[in-house]
């Protein structure tokens, strides 16, 4: 049953994890990096955390960094978040969430791995996914009361489906809809915990993207999120 379900879901959802290589060939996304977006307190312009606060060569997140627009020296605590407002069809209401944008894609073409900055075609694909209704049912419950379970209320992540990107939520919903056996449903639950916005994008052993994972015992949402391709 597992192979049959996987084949069906891949056939229906594989398009969500495609990207264009430099020569126009289609690559399969391994993971996408999402970054927090903040507002400079001096010039009031948006800055993307990955671009402004990360030394890619040294593999470090800087404590202090210049605003890319006005050169004011900033740190995380000095900045306000940028926000997005959208209609959440699962809740039938408008929600406000801290803004995160895709900045980097790791993908494969003919079993060779590459990295690229997110381009217009990638953004268009994400916009298409975000503006399309997920055809299957998925859980959308409010997180229960508790210090940890409600820690993300201030950034607008209040219900279980908010912890997933739209495409991974879509694939999960598809898997659940097609899966009949309890054993497979338990397996899907295990996978579901590894593809949330809790997954940190980190630098380890000289490589960005190595290590990472959720911060143990917490529902901490990092400023740099590694969105894994659930179909991988």
Annotate each predicted stretch with a short phrase.
Residues 1-232:
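Nucleic-acid modification enzymes, centered on SAM-dependent nucleic-acid methyltransferases
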């Amino acid at each position: 049953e597992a192979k049959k379900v996987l084949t069906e879901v891949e056939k229906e959802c594989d398009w969500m994890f495609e990207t264009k290589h430099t020569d126009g060939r289609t690559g399969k996304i391994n993971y996408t990096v999402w970054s927090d977006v903040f507002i400079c307190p001096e010039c009031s312009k948006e800055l993307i955390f990955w671009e402004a606060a990360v030394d890619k060569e040294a593999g470090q997140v800087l404590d202090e960094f210049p605003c890319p627009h006005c050169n004011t020296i900033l740190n995380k605590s000095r900045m306000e978040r940028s926000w997005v407002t959208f209609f959440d069809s699962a809740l039938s209401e408008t929600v406000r969430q801290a803004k995160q944008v895709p900045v980097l894609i790791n993908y494969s073409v003919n079993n060779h791995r590459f990295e690229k900055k997110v381009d217009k075609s990638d953004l268009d694909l994400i916009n298409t996914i975000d503006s399309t209704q997920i055809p299957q049912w998925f859980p959308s419950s409010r997180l229960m009361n508790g210090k940890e379970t409600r820690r993300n209320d201030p950034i607008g992540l209040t219900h279980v489906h908010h912890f997933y990107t739209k495409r991974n939520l879509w694939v999960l919903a598809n898997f659940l809809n097609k899966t009949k056996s309890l054993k497979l449903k338990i397996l899907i639950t295990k996978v579901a915990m590894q593809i949330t916005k809790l997954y940190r994008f980190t630098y380890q052993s000289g490589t960005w993207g190595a290590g990472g994972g959720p911060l143990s015992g917490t529902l901490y949402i990092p400023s740099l999120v590694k969105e894994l391709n659930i179909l991988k």
